A protein has these predicted regions:
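Conserved alpha/beta-domain cores
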Residues: 1-219
């Protein structure tokens, strides 16, 4: 779970990211031809642990973009952003923002796993036993742990927005469809949440309720 994934896989096997990024840019150019609209793809660099990982891959992505632009004789407009999945990333937020990452998304599933050293795939019986013994009251993979993982997210937001107030921040995974978690995200001024398609109606309703409650509390 913790080794050859995300940006690490890209760095070890450069042909993978080259193929993926090239496909994104070529598809964007073709989409512009078909629709007549400007397409701006957003390329995510996942599982960032250090700033150098991000800057290394950012440069490589830019090289692929230039290569495709020359081949297709078409300038590509794109954005590069990062997925935040490791606790360490919370403490280098301002450095990542400074290195021209324009968007960030918290992958709260992996952030929960790496913060608590729990795997959602094989800890079901453990969590059930913990709830039975009142060691925990809720499943942290269903409802965001605001005191642990939530604290990391708050630190990250503060550091990132201190560097750039306009930075776009959001979360993805099933916490994005949990009403209580959405209320927490709204209070911390995240720009968006993402979740499985079947949870989207719940997410929209919960986001609206969270915003209404926030406005009421300010009056």
């Amino acid at each position: 779970m913790l080794w050859t994934r995300g940006c690490r896989l890209w760095i070890l096997h450069h042909e993978i990211y080259q193929m993926q990024v090239r496909a994104i840019f070529e598809a964007a150019i073709e989409a512009e031809k078909v629709t007549g609209k400007t397409i701006v793809p957003e390329v995510m660099v996942p599982l960032i642990m250090t700033v150098k990982e991000f800057t290394f891959l950012k440069q490589k992505i830019e090289e692929v973009a230039e290569e495709v632009s020359k081949k297709k004789k078409k300038k590509i407009h794109y954005l590069i952003w990062s997925m935040i999945e490791l606790p360490q990333a919370a403490f280098i937020a301002w450095k990542l923002v400074k290195e021209w990452a324009q968007f960030f998304s918290f992958w709260t599933n992996d952030l929960t796993q790496t913060t608590k050293w729990l795997s959602r795939d094989d800890t079901g019986s453990l969590l059930q036993e913990y709830k039975t013994k009142w060691i925990i009251s809720k499943d942290p993979f269903v409802h965001l742990d605001e005191e642990g993982v939530g604290e990391l997210i708050e630190i990250w937001i503060q550091k990132a927005r201190k560097e750039d107030e306009s930075i776009k921040l959001g979360i993805c995974w099933e916490h994005g469809g949990d009403p209580k978690s959405i209320d927490f995200f709204n209070k911390n001024n995240l720009n968006y949440v993402s979740c499985s398609p079947y949870r989207v109606p719940i997410a929209r309703l919960s986001a609206a309720q969270a915003e209404i409650n926030e406005e009421k509390s300010e009056k």
